[in-house]
Structure formats: structure tokens, C-alpha cells
Swiss-Prot record:
Component of the Mediator complex. Belongs to the Mediator complex subunit 18 family. The gene is SRB5. It is found in: Nucleus. Keywords: Activator, Nucleus, Transcription, Transcription regulation. Component of the Mediator complex, a coactivator involved in the regulated transcription of nearly all RNA polymerase II-dependent genes. Mediator functions as a bridge to convey information from gene-specific regulatory proteins to the basal RNA polymerase II transcription machinery. Mediator is recruited to promoters by direct interactions with regulatory proteins and serves as a scaffold for the assembly of a functional preinitiation complex with RNA polymerase II and the general transcription factors. This is Mediator of RNA polymerase II transcription subunit 18. It comes from Kluyveromyces lactis (strain ATCC 8585 / CBS 2359 / DSM 70799 / NBRC 1267 / NRRL Y-1140 / WM37) (Yeast). One of its GO terms (molecular function) is transcription coregulator activity. GO terms for biological process: regulation of transcription by RNA polymerase II; termination of RNA polymerase II transcription.
């Protein structure tokens, strides 16, 4: 479990090169390209699930997320890629990426590593300067069958899925910053298609993870680091807190 402090923003496509250059200088590290395939599941509505715990308290059902890294070789047909690759991604399809073949491969491979994640809605408060969210995560290294059958046994069914591709900056202070695009992945019968959600721009996330929510010193340190970064970037990127409802994983939200 981690307590994640975060700030968010968005930039237009034209601002990407300058943003990368600025963050490379601030972080003292070159950007690292990443890609993740994410599957969101919700509790199976056909199952009768208790909505109260042992203390007779109401428990709201939440979505869970499975994520796995997409090999960069899959994105570029084996070619070596760097941060400039992101400048070519402005369409619904990633030309060099066969999403249907990729999904078939990972669905049939029970050795694929998946991150299994459950997250709470960020803490409320009118005077908050940062988003603060509790995230529970475990790693599934293998399963006896496909990941779909594994998640089905847990009582969950598919809700939606997406791919995010971007660059990541690791600051010496422990702050991590990501600039990325998001594609919704739609499966209908035997067909698989992608739809670019972040058209004409990029999402940005700056985060700092603390292992224990009771570690006040680390939480204060992370808060100071993120707020300083916000000040340093004020002429380039407007980091802010999103509406906490857009990060709400509870089942009744967005239904």
C-alpha cells in the first residue's frame, strides 16, 4: 500500500518538445519511454455480493485495475525508440502496433506479470493543495489459467480497457513525472480497435509515493517537493488538482 501525492495537468502537442527539454533539465535525467495495457474490472452484477462488512457497516463496491507493460519492441516493430516517438502519435491507431495480436498473446500467456490495483477516492477537503490517494497494489506473476479466468474467479467482469504510452522522468528527490497519451481499446466480437482519447494533447502527472500513510515526515517532504515543482514549472505547465470524482473507482460512479 502507498499513499500517493499527485498533481496533474495537460499540454497541447506543440508544447511537448519544450516540456521534455525542461523536465530533462529539472530532473537531471533523460526521459524514459513507457507503455502500459490496462484492464478495468467491476464486480460481477450477476453475483449476490454482501454490501456490509462484519461490523454491519456499508461497504461500497469498487473497480479494480490490472496493468502490464507493453514491450517497446511491439510498438516499433523491433526498432529502437526514444521520446521522439511520441511526436508521431496523433491518430486512433498506432501504425506499427498490432493491438489485436498483442491482446491475443497476453490473454493466452499465463506467465505475464500483472499489477493488481485497488485505489480509494482521493481525500476530500477544500483547502488541499495536492491530491492524496491510497493505492493498494500486488503483483501477479503467474496464474493457473488466463488472467481473464483468474479475475472471473474473483467475481469480477470486464468494464473497459485502455493503453497509455508516454515518457517518464525520475527526479533524484523521488518525484516521478509522466507525460502520456491514452487510447481506449474496444473489443467487439473478434475485432479490436483503438480510439485516441487525448487528441491534440498530452496528460501530465507528477507524483510522490509514501509507503505508510502514518509517515508524516515523508508526506510533508513529498508535499514540499511537489509544490516546489509546481512553482518551478508555472511558466510552462500549470500543475493542479483535478476533481476527485474523476478518480473515483466506486461502482456507482460513472455507471
Amino acid at each position: 500500500m502507498v499513499q500517493q501525492l499527485a498533481l496533474f495537468s495537460a499540454i497541447e502537442d506543440e508544447s511537448y518538445p519544450l516540456s521534455v527539454e525542461t523536465l530533462t533539465i529539472l530532473s537531471s535525467n533523460r526521459p524514459r519511454l513507457f507503455a502500459n495495457f490496462n484492464k478495468i474490472y467491476k464486480p460481477n452484477p450477476s453475483l449476490q455480493i454482501e454490501k456490509v462488512n462484519a461490523k454491519n457497516q456499508l461497504v461500497e463496491q469498487t473497480r479494480v485495475k490490472l496493468s502490464t507493460a507493453v514491450p517497446l519492441s511491439k510498438l516499433g516493430n523491433g526498432a529502437e525508440l526514444n521520446y521522439h516517438f511520441m511526436e508521431k502519435l496523433s491518430n486512433d491507431d498506432i501504425e506499427s502496433f498490432n493491438v489485436k495480436s498483442y491482446i491475443q498473446d497476453i490473454d493466452s500467456n499465463n506467465k505475464t506479470n500483472w499489477a493488481f490495483q485497488i485505489s480509494d477516492i482521493p481525500a476530500a477537503g477544500n483547502n488541499r493543495k495536492l491530491s492524496s490517494q491510497t493505492i493498494h497494489e500486488s503483483v501477479i506473476q503467474s496464474s493457473s489459467g488466463s488472467v481473464s479466468s483468474f479475475i472471473d474467479e474473483l467475481g469480477y467482469v470486464n468494464d473497459f480497457q485502455y493503453i497509455n504510452v508516454g515518457v517518464k522522468f525520475q527526479f533524484l528527490s523521488g518525484v516521478v513525472m509522466e507525460i502520456y497519451k491514452v487510447w481506449q481499446v474496444v473489443q467487439k466480437d473478434q475485432e479490436v480497435s483503438m480510439k485516441l482519447i487525448t487528441k491534440d494533447g498530452f496528460m501530465i502527472k507528477a507524483m510522490y509515493n509514501v509507503n505508510k500513510s502514518t509517515d508524516i515526515e515523508s508526506l510533508n517532504n513529498g508535499s514540499q517537493l511537489l509544490l516546489k515543482l509546481k512553482t518551478d514549472l508555472r511558466d510552462y505547465i500549470e500543475l493542479d488538482i483535478p476533481d476527485r470524482k474523476c478518480m473515483d473507482t466506486r461502482l456507482n460512479h460513472l455507471d
